[in-house]
């Protein structure tokens, strides 16, 4: 079984011989980005860097962010979301497999009318969690206050991006709410559910 990231040939403009680069590097050149892991600072910084580079390279071409993520760090996810709103090109979001927690938050941050879920994708929303480490009582109180601020921020974004009333989002975030692709479309997290006859539209 092959180990590591697969490599593909790529020929630079003006060069006769192709060089081998990893498949993700090749796809980034086509403005196709991937979030296929737990959301942490490292992957967030990578995605932010790529989006900023592509934004500077050509502001007229859309970007496509494919998501299969169980979620992760709240601030890392928010930083990706904010960058998606900052760059000039529209960012399409496509859910493959699972977009849970911060994964669904990033999914809903795609350009409205350009958020897609594949037919068997699953989407989950819930409130941000805290580590509640063993520390001073005052530190725990400060952390709890910060979690409440983050929850308020995330709730307001879901309200804005889905069109759902504040009370609905607040109530649903009290627990893990899983949705099918169609349910996520009805909820407003995505705009379309992809079907085989329109699969080519994901990159066109």
Curated annotation (Swiss-Prot):
Residues of the active site: 101 (nucleophile), 126
Functional description taken from the UniProt entry: Cleaves peptides in various proteins in a process that requires ATP hydrolysis. Has a chymotrypsin-like activity. Plays a major role in the degradation of misfolded proteins.
Entry keywords, A to Z: Chloroplast, Hydrolase, Plastid, Protease, Serine protease
Self-association state and partner proteins as the record states: Component of the chloroplastic Clp protease core complex.
UniProt organism field: Anthoceros angustus (Hornwort)
Subcellular location, principal: plastid
GO cellular component: chloroplast stroma; endopeptidase Clp complex
Keyword Chloroplast among UniProt keywords: yes
Pfam short name (any one): CLP_protease
Gene this chain is encoded by: clpP
Protein name, per record: ATP-dependent Clp protease proteolytic subunit
């Amino acid at each position: 079984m092959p180990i590591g990231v697969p490599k593909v040939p790529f020929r630079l403009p003006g060069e006769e011989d192709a060089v081998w680069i990893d498949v993700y590097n090749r796809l980034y050149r086509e403005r196709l980005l991937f979030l296929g892991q737990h959301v942490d600072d490292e992957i967030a910084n990578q995605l932010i860097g790529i989006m900023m580079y592509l934004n500077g390279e050509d502001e007229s071409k859309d970007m496509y962010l494919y998501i299969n993520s169980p979620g992760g760090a709240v601030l890392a996810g928010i930083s990706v979301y904010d960058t998606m709103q900052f760059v000039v090109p529209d960012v399409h979001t496509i859910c493959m497999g699972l977009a849970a927690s911060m994964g669904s938050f990033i999914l809903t941050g795609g350009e409205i009318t350009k958020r897609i879920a594949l037919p068997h994708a699953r989407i989950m929303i819930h409130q941000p969690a805290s580590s509640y480490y063993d520390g001073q009582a005052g530190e725990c109180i400060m952390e709890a206050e910060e979690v409440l601020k983050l929850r308020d921020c995330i709730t307001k974004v879901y309200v804005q991006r889905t069109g759902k009333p504040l009370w609905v989002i607040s109530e649903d975030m009290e627990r893990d709410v899983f949705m099918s692709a169609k349910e996520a479309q009805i909820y407003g997290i995505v705009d379309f559910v992809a079907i085989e006859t329109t699969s080519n539209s994901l990159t066109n």
